């Protein structure tokens, strides 16, 4: 069936639910006026509420489309073993291992380079503040 039919069915169901809520509110206010607050809702309002709820749920289920299988084997058929436990979003390339595990002669020279670049940067900042 056409998707617009199911959307119309959901609309009708929601309208009927709103009407049932309005009817229940009117019945409650009528019961307060007549001082008969211990009576329950009439059966027609209860049936309208249940039927409208069922129609709305039926329409929503058809709008949602096909459900997926709960069994994971259908999803796992398309994946290889290598990609099964592969989570590239957890890869971190900017970590301290690069500094900890490099040879000591390059570490000393890079520290000196970093110190000289830091001092030149500080000097540039001081010059910009003096102006």
Curated annotation (Swiss-Prot):
Protein name: ER membrane protein complex subunit 5
Residues annotated with Phosphoserine modification: 120
Assembly mode: Component of the ER membrane protein complex (EMC).
Location of the protein in the cell: Endoplasmic reticulum membrane; Golgi apparatus membrane; Early endosome membrane
Pfam families: MMgT
Transmembrane regions listed in the UniProt entry: 4-22, 44-63
BP terms from Gene Ontology: magnesium ion transport; protein insertion into ER membrane by stop-transfer membrane-anchor sequence; tail-anchored membrane protein insertion into ER membrane
InterPro entries reported for this sequence: MMgT (IPR018937)
Superkingdom of the organism of origin: Eukaryota
Topology, Lumenal side: 23-43
Gene Ontology terms, MF aspect: magnesium ion transmembrane transporter activity
Gene of this entry: MMGT1
